Amino acid sequence: ERAEDSGNESEGDHEELSALVDMGHDALWDVDDL
């Protein structure tokens, strides 16, 4: 993953991105259901 290449500085951001991505996927699934 790119997080490893970027170093430890990206770990915090990566966690936030993961949360946002999870929310995004949920939103996309909701749209697909419609």
UniProtKB/Swiss-Prot annotation:
Chain residue ranges for the region called Disordered: 1-21
Major subcellular location class: host cell
Biased composition (Acidic residues): 1-14
Subcellular location, record wording: Host membrane
Disulfide bond sites: none
Modified residues (Phosphoserine): 6, 10
Annotated control of activity: Ion channel activity is inhibited by hexamethylene amiloride in vitro.
Changes after translation: Phosphorylated by host CK2. This phosphorylation is necessary for interaction with human BRCP and degradation of CD4.
One of the GO BP terms on file: receptor catabolic process
Keywords: AIDS, Apoptosis, Host membrane, Host-virus interaction, Ion channel, Ion transport, Membrane, Phosphoprotein, Transmembrane, Transport
Record InterPro entries: Vpu, Vpu_cyt_dom_sf
GO molecular function: CD4 receptor binding; monoatomic cation channel activity
Membrane topology: Single-pass type I membrane protein
Gene Ontology, cellular component aspect: host cell membrane; membrane
Pfam families: Vpu
Role this protein plays: Enhances virion budding, by targeting human CD4 and Tetherin/BST2 to proteasome degradation. Degradation of CD4 prevents any unwanted premature interactions between viral Env and its receptor human CD4 in the endoplasmic reticulum. Degradation of antiretroviral protein Tetherin/BST2 is important for virion budding, as BST2 tethers new viral particles to the host cell membrane. Mechanistically, Vpu bridges either CD4 or BST2 to BTRC, a substrate recognition subunit of the Skp1/Cullin/F-box protein E3 ubiquitin ligase, induces their ubiquitination and subsequent proteasomal degradation.
Family affiliation: Belongs to the HIV-1 VPU protein family.
Subunit structure: Homopentamer. Interacts with host CD4 and BRTC; these interactions induce proteasomal degradation of CD4. Interacts with host BST2; this interaction leads to the degradation of host BST2. Interacts with host FBXW11. Interacts with host AP1M1; this interaction plays a role in the mistrafficking and subsequent degradation of host BST2. Interacts with host RANBP2; this interaction allows Vpu to down-regulate host BLM sumoylation.
Domain notes: The N-terminus and transmembrane domains are required for self-oligomerization and proper virion budding, whereas the cytoplasmic domain is required for CD4 degradation. The cytoplasmic domain is composed of 2 amphipathic alpha helix that form a U-shape.
Further comment: HIV-1 lineages are divided in three main groups, M (for Major), O (for Outlier), and N (for New, or Non-M, Non-O). The vast majority of strains found worldwide belong to the group M. Group O seems to be endemic to and largely confined to Cameroon and neighboring countries in West Central Africa, where these viruses represent a small minority of HIV-1 strains. The group N is represented by a limited number of isolates from Cameroonian persons. The group M is further subdivided in 9 clades or subtypes (A to D, F to H, J and K).
Protein known as: Protein Vpu
Biological classification of the source: Viruses, Riboviria, Pararnavirae, Artverviricota, Revtraviricetes
Gene assigned in the entry: vpu
